[in-house]
Amino acid sequence: MALQELRVADLDDGFTRIANELLEAVMHAGLSQHQLLVFMAVMRKTYGFNKKSDWVSNEQLSELTGILPHKCSAAKSVLVKRGILTQTGRVIGINKTVSEWSSLP
């Protein structure tokens, strides 16, 4: 039996800073599992690098979430339609104005 490498999460290895209001809003947004994972992946790819938005491909989202790229695209489209994510061309980010988020379609 092969031994698994011990992995320990440590702030010294990096962290993603997020406003409590944003975290609470996403918990109350009623997202599907895929939508939540895509939201978190976008958060990691943007806020995790101290950026408000960035070019993030469906393949990058797929690598982070384990979801197929076309399913990442579908989840991302719903999040953009609801105003939870913003998208201009290929650049995507999180809409911090949580009062603009629409409820379930």
How should these model regions be labeled?
Residues 37-40:
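Hydrophobic residues on short alpha-helical segments
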Residues 1-20, 86, 102:
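An N-terminal low-complexity regulatory-tail signal and nearby short nucleic-acid-interaction modules
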Residues 5-8, 25-29, 34, 45-100:
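Winged helix-turn-helix DNA-binding recognition segment
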Residues 18, 34-35:
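Alpha-helical structural motif
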